[in-house]
Amino acid sequence: MLKDSGREKISDKRIDSPVSDDKFINKLFERLVALKVEFKNVDFRYCIFDAAYLRNCSFEECDFTGCRFINCNLAGCSFNGCKFDYASFDKSQIDNDILDVGCPGPENLKLKFARSLRMNYQQIGDAKSANKAISIELQATEDHLHKAWKSKESYYRKKYKGLDRLKVYGEWLEFKLLDLIWGNGESSWKLFRAVLVVLLIITAIHVIGFGNPSLVESYVEALWMSPQVFLGIVSP
């Protein structure tokens, strides 16, 4: 049985004066315009902002829980003490300092928030902001997986029991292993270190199996050959 969701559509409106202690819950704002407007303690829960132009506005203690920002321009906006639980962003211009002041507290919500912004920045070609979001997403993912199997917090112990707890422990181990090897794709130094370790192992195996461990020349020759063995160009 289909019922009306009760979402009100507000199209082609402009806000030109400060807004304080107001509620706009479950609204669809289409092409909303505001420039250098102050919003204080405004409730925007579950709103959808479609093609909104909100440049250089300030938002203080506003609630954006469950909001969606689609094709919006939020450049120059500041957010202080705002709530972004379950908020998502799609092809929207927004300064990356929101990652410093807007992340939700719980790790599972923080990683979803950072992931949404990371994908958003990738969509608009902002590599620097995407990298910043990735760093926060990875740290939040590690913290979430660690708490999921180890924390005594009621949320985690209620959600992850028995085999689910064991499974998430395996995911945490995999995450830590990939972080150790190559920083989950974000650390060139860790990748270089991992390759160097592999080359040294190949060198040691070659010297023990085919060279003379008492001769320095055997180590030099084996080390010289190790990249070719690693790449499959030659056989040991």
Region spans (language model):
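Tandem repeat scaffolds
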Residues: 1-136, 141, 150-151
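Pore-loop/selectivity-filter region of tetrameric P-loop cation channels
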Residues: 181-184, 209-236
